[in-house]
Design a protein with these regions (language model features):
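Peripheral, non-transmembrane regulatory/ligand-interaction domains of membrane transport proteins
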Residues: 1-197, 201-202, 211, 215-222, ...
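Hydrophobic alpha-helical transmembrane segments and their immediately adjacent juxtamembrane loops
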Residues: 35, 41, 217-308
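Alpha-helical membrane-protein architecture signal
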Residues: 130, 167-170, 205, 234, ...
Length: 308
């Protein structure tokens, strides 16, 4: 799906392309790709790079075209292997043509358009738009991090009532998401540090870049803190599981010892040897009493040693 936006003031939709407008392409169809490649003559590998979910944040030039790939947050199904991840957003520019391409429909881009319309100021130029996309991505990383923290706290509350596989698996998935976040944020920071020297930055852009740096730093540090907390939490519950397993094995071993003693005594009295009790009518009762006494003493000893 493609949309032509007039970047002046309230960001209105245009019926067709005009010079210096913004072409927003989301989940591009074959027709959209042909339009970009045939009409605007952008390098064909630009789109293939943007469609690669593992493409790192970077920029490059080819035949007058500039390609910027920014990593932005994206939410899958909550029960998926990595519910929160990042996807590439491509920014393509040449003279009076500015195009953004994303192969996923993200809340960030929807909110970006809505927010710019509320500002009712538009973009001063394509450089202003690029850095505002950086700012929006940082803000949305922070929003997603709050959601991740909420899920972590929920899983921890469930684990406080009893360790279960579902909550532990959920924490493991969130750890994977935080790994994707921290890697992408660092990549975006490196990209930003390079672009501010490559693009024509005016005084307003410099102020905007400072805001982006602040938000990016906060997002990176928050992700790092949550990742450390989650790792510590996982280690704690792993220790609890190991401790519970050791306690269970110790208890079972102690019970086995207590149960073994009557069997041992019965075996001794049951041997074909002279023991003075083979002809006594009280032999069985005597063996039974000894078994009970020995078992009780062993039980008391193990309880005293806190092995039961």
């Amino acid at each position: 799906m493609k949309t032509f936006w007039n970047i002046d003031k309230n960001l209105t939709v245009l019926n067709e392309w005009q010079p210096n407008c913004w072409i927003q392409v989301t989940c591009p169809t074959d027709e959209d790709q042909r339009l970009l490649e045939d009409e605007f003559k952008i390098p064909d590998y630009f789109l293939s790079d943007i469609s690669d979910t593992d493409e790192r944040a970077r920029y490059e030039y080819d035949d007058g075209w500039m390609l910027i790939i920014l990593r932005i947050p994206y939410v899958k199904e909550i029960r998926s292997r990595t519910p929160y991840t990042t996807v590439p957003l491509g920014i393509i520019h040449k003279r009076d043509v500015t195009i953004t391409v994303c192969y996923y429909e993200t809340n960030m881009m929807i909110d970006f358009v809505s927010y710019q319309q509320k500002r009712n100021e538009g973009f001063t130029d394509y450089v202003d738009m690029i850095f505002r996309l950086f700012l929006s991505s940082a803000v949305w990383y922070l929003k997603r991090l709050k959601q991740i923290n909420s899920l972590i706290e929920k899983a921890k509350r469930n684990l406080d009532h009893g360790v279960n596989n579902e909550s532990l698996i959920g924490l493991s998935r969130l750890q994977d998401s935080l790994t994707y976040f921290i890697t992408s944020i660092r990549g975006n920071e490196n990209l930003l540090s390079k672009l501010k020297f490559k693009l024509q930055v005016d005084e307003l852009d410099a102020d905007l870049i400072e805001d982006v740096n602040i938000e990016m730093t906060q997002a990176r540090e928050t992700t790092s803190i949550y990742s450390d907390i989650l790792e510590s939490t996982m280690d704690t519950y792993s220790s609890i599981i190991n401790n519970n397993m050791n306690t269970t094995m110790r208890t079972l071993t102690s019970i086995s010892i207590v149960m073994m003693l009557p069997t041992l005594i019965s075996s001794l009295f049951g041997m074909n040897l002279l023991n003075g009790m083979e002809n006594s009518p009280y032999g069985f009762a005597f063996a039974l009493i000894i078994s009970v006494i020995v078992s009780a003493l062993s039980w008391g000893f193990l309880r005293y040693k806190r092995l039961l």
